[in-house]
C-alpha cells in the first residue's frame, strides 16, 4: 500500500513538471513566431527602464513628489524603473 502511494505521487509530480515545461516551451515558441528577435526585446526593456526613470526625474524637478508612472504589459514601476511583474 505504501509503495503504491509513493509510486502514484511520484507519477503525479512528474506529470505536473512535464506539463509545466511543455507550457513554457509552447509560450516561448509563440513569442518567437511573432518575429521579434532577442535584440529587439532587449531594446524594448531598456526603453521601458529609461521612460520610467526619466518621468520621475521630471516630476522631482517640478518640486512635486515623484508619482510612479504606470508601466504596461506586465511591467510595474519600482525604484524609478519599470520591472517585470
UniProtKB/Swiss-Prot annotation:
**Which residue ranges make up the pro-region?**
23-48
**Source superkingdom:** Eukaryota
Query: Where is the protein situated, by its record's location annotation?
Result: Secreted
Q: Name its species.
A: Cyriopagopus hainanus (Chinese bird spider)
Predominant localisation class:
secreted
Say what the protein does. Postsynaptic neurotoxin.
Q: Which PROSITE patterns match?
A: HWTX_2 (PS60022)
Free-text tissue specificity from the UniProt record = Expressed by the venom gland.
According to UniProt, the name of this protein is: U4-theraphotoxin-Hhn1r
Amino acid at each position: 500500500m505504501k509503495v503504491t502511494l509513493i509510486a502514484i505521487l511520484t507519477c503525479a509530480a512528474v506529470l505536473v513538471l512535464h506539463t509545466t515545461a511543455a507550457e513554457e516551451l509552447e509560450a516561448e515558441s509563440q513569442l518567437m513566431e511573432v518575429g521579434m528577435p532577442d535584440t529587439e526585446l532587449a531594446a524594448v526593456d531598456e526603453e521601458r527602464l529609461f521612460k520610467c526613470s526619466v518621468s520621475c526625474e521630471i516630476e522631482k524637478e517640478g518640486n512635486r513628489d515623484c508619482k510612479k508612472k504606470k508601466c504596461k504589459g506586465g511591467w510595474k514601476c519600482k525604484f524609478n524603473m519599470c520591472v517585470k511583474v
